[in-house]
Amino acid sequence: MSNYFSMEAFDYDDIQLVPNKCIIKSRKEADTSVKFGSRTFKIPVVPANMESVIDDDLAIWLAENGYYYVMHRFHPEKRANFIKMMHDKGLFASISVGIKDSEYDFIDYLAKEKIIPEYITIDVAHGHSDYVIKMIKYIKDKLPDTFLTAGNIATPEAVRELENAGADATKVGVGPGRACITKLKTGFGTGGWQLAALRMCSKAARKPLIADGGIRHNGDIAKSVRFGASMVMIGSLFAGHEESPGNLITIDGKRYKQYWGSASEVQKGAYRNVEGKQMLVPYRGSIKDTLREMQEDLQSSISYAGGKDLSAIRVVDYVIVKSSIFDGDK
């Protein structure tokens, strides 16, 4: 058993960041931008690459407005045309791939036709795998200029192996998301200790990390940054918007959007190896407003951290207050 698993496990609700002296007059002075790959984005946040969260139209809007995105991989036959469409619009292309044999043919096709996406994410539930490592090496050989993220993983060993194979970033989180039931179906995962897993992985990482799953509040973004995330992937908080692909449903006068996990029966179209579920999330209006609110809250976080940009958050002190943060808010 590895020594780091003897440390105390904690998650987002268990942590509070400790304020430092503020050095800016207004939170508007705080810079929330982050460089990821060759590009700089407004905030360190990316909607989850799930079919109920992202589609072509939203990807276009995000890219046009300075946000990072990752297109899902559930219509594989459309991906090459998606890359072409984004490039025709003068925008960056960011796609997902799996590890099936057909994906190698797809990578060969992209290389041959010189349809080169700026970003690729290898999207596998258990990313610490010989087959993911094989795919990393293949993509970096065929598409060396593409920024490659691989995941999902949960341990420092996984970070080291995927980075050593050539991954430019790794994605941390096995089953902590609201629509994921991996921890219930398999007994494995980072549900309940996602933030601690991120902390452990960050100690081994030499390249960027994406924290994926378990985000319930905007303040969790700052906590993710504190514990090593360059980007924070969010599903359920983004699924309820006008621009979200899920169907809009009204129940007793209240509006909801459909949201489902990538390994759900809805996504797979069959009851086979299901590790996700479907749910309804409250309708939240335009995603523009949510992204603006996230940026403003992150600016406030920077001001509390006593700095002018995200780097200040990475070095603040923190306290563990087991399950007591929201006692006064319930």
From Swiss-Prot:
Keywords: NADP, Oxidoreductase. Belongs to the IMPDH/GMPR family. GuaC type 2 subfamily. The lineage of its organism: Bacteria, Bacillati, Bacillota, Bacilli, Lactobacillales. This is GMP reductase. Its EC number is 1.7.1.7. Disulfide bonds: none annotated. Catalyzes the irreversible NADPH-dependent deamination of GMP to IMP. It functions in the conversion of nucleobase, nucleoside and nucleotide derivatives of G to A nucleotides, and in maintaining the intracellular balance of A and G nucleotides. GO terms for molecular function: GMP reductase activity. It catalyses: IMP + NH4(+) + NADP(+) = GMP + NADPH + 2 H(+). It is an enzyme of class 1 (oxidoreductase). Coiled coil: none annotated. GO terms for cellular component: cytosol; GMP reductase complex. NADP(+) binds at residues 209-232. One of its GO terms (biological process) is purine nucleotide metabolic process. The active site is at C180.
